[in-house]
Amino acid sequence: MNKKLMYIFAIFIVAAITCISQPKKTTLRDKAMVNYAFDYLSSPGSLPFTTAATELSAIHGHSTSQYRLGEFYLHGSDGKPLDYTQARYWYEQSAEQENPRAQSKLGWIYLKGLGVKPDTRKAILWYKEAAEQGYAHAQYTLGLIYRNGSGINVNHYESQKWLKLTAKQHYKNAERLLAGLPAH
């Protein structure tokens, strides 16, 4: 067995033990270790190892890995088939740990009806979870939903509220949209 494979195996074992010992919430140390493993394994030719590492740590509760596994299923990438049900499952696991990117993706799934019946109200709930943590993309999307009345009544006040929060984070599209909204 060559040195690279032994090193990869050691990283998997350490990551698995760390994830098992922290089932509810991951620590900064856990995140750093898993991110290091992902960076190391992201070199050309390491796809099976990256996917396996992601799946292993996702199963053991690592929020970022759960989000990434959701991405694999949502896009049918990294050796995983396109499967909206699995994507939603893994995003939900990550969202329960307050991962704003996963919460925002759940909003997208419900807004677009990917594997579920479109549900603007559920989408808004998930986007708000992420937006209230300061996640600019979710804030911007909420601003658009309220501005355009996507499945709900137009609400300029809510639209401006979320777009202003997004603009404070230098999100240029939000700044442009704010210029065209009626003042409140």
From Swiss-Prot:
Family affiliation: To E.coli YbeQ.
Q: Where are the Sel1-like repeats?
A: 64-98, 100-135, 136-169
Q: What is the lineage of its organism?
A: Bacteria, Pseudomonadati, Pseudomonadota, Gammaproteobacteria, Enterobacterales
Q: Which residues form a coiled coil?
A: none
Query: By what name is this protein known?
Result: Sel1-repeat-containing protein YbeT
Q: How is this protein induced?
A: Repressed by the toxin-antitoxin module MqsR-MqsA.
Question: Keywords in UniProt for this one?
Answer: Repeat
Family matches, as SUPFAM superfamilies: HCP-like
Q: Does the keyword Repeat apply?
A: yes
Species name for this entry? Answer: Escherichia coli (strain K12)
What domain of life is recorded for the organism? Bacteria
